[in-house]
């Protein structure tokens, strides 16, 4: 009996140790990514809903926007941006890590895969502005890297708390000339830019080794830009998994620009051995037929990239009503709350 009790105590102790170790381990696998991502950025949804916006399907029935995207347009993935300390402005701020995590949980519960876009800014980061968060303004470069590490891990932990492990995380957004200016401006110091990318990449992997990281540039048809930026990062030791691209053509030049983007994608794959994802696309709201054709063409051509190296296509904020946020007109919903035919390009 004494031996039995001793064995039981040892067994319980061993189980406690295993439990403690398990709690401390990072998430090892992301959610199962789709074979090909048909995606939409839906980051404006929480702010629009807070203002009372609702959406209808093509039959005029009011439904949850995520469900409409999934059921009517075969959308299987969503993209969600994260600001550091955003203002309460619904369009240009609002989406801190907690609101982003709640939206990600909602999308995951609908069966979606998740891409996060870490702007490392309090508001928009894009080719024209890569502004440090106000709280980081006085930091040394080492402190800036520490802040990137801590913020990235905090975002991943907030996602984990909601039961979400992102499939993809962008380290910055449209970082054509680097990030966190001026310290991480590529024309000032490509090495600093590479170190910041590495810091973000390593922070993501410390929480979820299976999550894929992305460096994302605008102008997907601009091969010279990508060779300079991506090549510069790699030559300075940057580590990341995927090359992301944006493409916003017009109704008259979209076909040529799609072909240029596919040519660039194939060149990136050949040069650097990394797959490509189209992180953002959009075309004029009032050209729905052209937009549908554009979406169908880029979806098909990315999906047909050799070796499965074209991972997917994401339409940026299709749920935006016409003229939202001072004039954004590349959405796919009408003023009456019903969709245009634009997203039908994702079908099949």
Describe the function of each predicted region.
Residues 90-101, 125-231, 236-240, 251-263, ...:
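Active-site cleft segment of glycoside hydrolase catalytic domains centered on the general acid/base Glu
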Residues 43-45, 83-85, 119-123, 171-176, ...:
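Active-site beta-loop-alpha junctions enriched in small/polar residues
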Residues 34, 64-74, 102-113, 157-164, ...:
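Acidic (Asp/Glu)-rich catalytic clusters
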Residues 19-29:
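C-terminal segment of classical bacterial N-terminal signal peptides
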Residues 40, 117, 169, 243, ...:
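Conserved, mostly hydrophobic/aromatic
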Residues 33-113, 119-148, 154, 170:
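N-terminal substrate-binding region of glycoside hydrolase catalytic domains
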Residues 50, 54, 267-273, 284-348:
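Aromatic-rich peripheral "rim/lid" segments of glycoside hydrolase catalytic domains that contact
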């Amino acid at each position: 009996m004494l031996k039995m009790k001793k064995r039981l105590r040892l067994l319980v102790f061993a189980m406690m140790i295993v439990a403690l170790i398990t709690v401390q381990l990072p998430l090892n696998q992301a959610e199962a990514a789709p074979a090909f991502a048909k995606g939409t950025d839906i980051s404006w949804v929480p702010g629009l809903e807070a203002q009372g916006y609702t959406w209808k399907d093509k039959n005029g029935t009011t439904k949850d926007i995520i469900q409409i995207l999934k059921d009517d347009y075969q959308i299987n993935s969503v993209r969600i941006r994260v600001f550091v300390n955003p203002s309460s402005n619904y369009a240009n701020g609002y989406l801190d890590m907690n609101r982003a995590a709640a939206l990600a949980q909602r999308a995951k519960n609908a069966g979606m895969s998740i891409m996060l876009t870490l702007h490392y800014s309090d508001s928009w980061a894009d080719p024209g502005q890569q502004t440090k968060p106000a709280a980081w303004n006085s930091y040394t470069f080492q402190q800036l890297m520490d802040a990137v590490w801590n913020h990235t891990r905090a975002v991943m932990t907030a996602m984990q708390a909601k039961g979400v492990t992102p499939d993809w995380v962008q380290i910055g957004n449209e970082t054509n000339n680097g990030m966190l200016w001026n310290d991480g401006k590529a024309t000032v110091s490509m090495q600093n830019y590479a170190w910041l990318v590495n810091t973000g990449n390593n922070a993501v992997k410390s929480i979820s080794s299976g999550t894929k990281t992305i460096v994302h540039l605008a102008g997907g048809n601009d091969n010279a830009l990508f060779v300079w930026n991506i090549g510069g990062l790699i030559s300075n030791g940057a580590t990341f998994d995927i090359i992301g691209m944006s493409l916003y053509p017009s109704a008259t030049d979209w076909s040529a620009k799609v072909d240029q983007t596919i040519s660039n994608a194939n060149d990136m794959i050949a040069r650097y051995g990394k797959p490509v994802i189209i992180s953002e696309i959009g075309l004029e709201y009032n050209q729905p037929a052209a937009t549908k054709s554009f979406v169908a063409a880029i979806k098909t051509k990315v999906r047909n990239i050799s070796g499965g190296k074209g991972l997917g296509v994401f339409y940026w904020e299709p749920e935006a009503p016409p003229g939202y946020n001072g004039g954004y007109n590349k959405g796919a919903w009408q003023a009456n709350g019903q969709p245009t035919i634009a997203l039908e390009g994702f079908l099949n």
